[in-house]
């Protein structure tokens, strides 16, 4: 873990910090973790905290402590009609940060209880997280996607590169 977090460029590392940040299209929240990953939240309520954490050593099982910065989207327990939107940039370079505006790098195609569909404009990758059987609108690759399916595809030259999986572990309860 890391003991600091950047909130819109400002480094925070005071133990006991607790902040609630509302995010919107016009006022997105930008967070950077200690590993250089950036999180852009443009819909939702973001909570940030820096606390001392107690745990056990992985091998010795002796008590250990450390300072950890955490952030999460607070959407409540089983929200009705809840909504949030965020994007993660994995360790972007300085050039990428200067060249691209985060909100212009992706487009949400669908975001509802049936499916989340997002187009990564920079790479041309289309991604789907399907929760219920659905017929994607305005898609020339799929006419139907079954529930519990994750799909990503990218057109390369005259080929279609695709990754498909089910997040269901099929473990009987």
List each language-model region with its residue ranges.
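Beta-strand-rich interaction surfaces with strong enrichment in secreted/lumenal proteins
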Residues: 71-77, 150-151
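Non-catalytic terminal regions with compositionally biased, polar/charged low complexity
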Residues: 89-173
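Context-gated lysine
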Residues: 2, 11-12, 42-47, 59, ...
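Trp/Gly-enriched beta-strand surface patches
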Residues: 4-72, 138-144
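Beta-sheet entry/capping signal
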Residues: 28, 37-38, 83-85, 161
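Conserved catalytic-core segments centered on acid/base and nucleophilic motifs
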Residues: 1-5, 86
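Short Pro-Gly-centered flexible turn/kink motifs
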Residues: 79-90
């Amino acid at each position: 873990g890391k003991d600091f977090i950047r909130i819109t460029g400002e480094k925070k590392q005071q133990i006991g910090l607790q902040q609630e940040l509302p995010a919107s299209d016009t006022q997105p929240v930008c967070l950077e973790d200690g590993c250089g990953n950036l999180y852009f939240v443009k819909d939702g309520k973001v909570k940030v905290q820096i606390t001392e954490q107690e745990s056990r050593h992985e091998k010795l099982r002796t008590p250990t402590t450390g300072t950890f910065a955490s952030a999460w989207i607070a959407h409540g327990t089983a929200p009705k009609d809840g909504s949030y939107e965020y994007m993660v940039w994995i360790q972007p370079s300085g050039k990428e940060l200067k060249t691209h505006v985060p909100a212009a790098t992706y487009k949400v195609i669908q975001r509802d209880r049936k499916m989340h569909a997002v187009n990564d404009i920079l790479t041309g990758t289309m991604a789907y997280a399907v929760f219920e059987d659905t017929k994607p609108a305005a898609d020339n690759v799929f006419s139907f996607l079954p529930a519990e399916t994750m799909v990503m595809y990218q057109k390369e030259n005259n080929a279609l590169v695709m990754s498909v999986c089910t997040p269901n572990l099929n473990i009987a309860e």
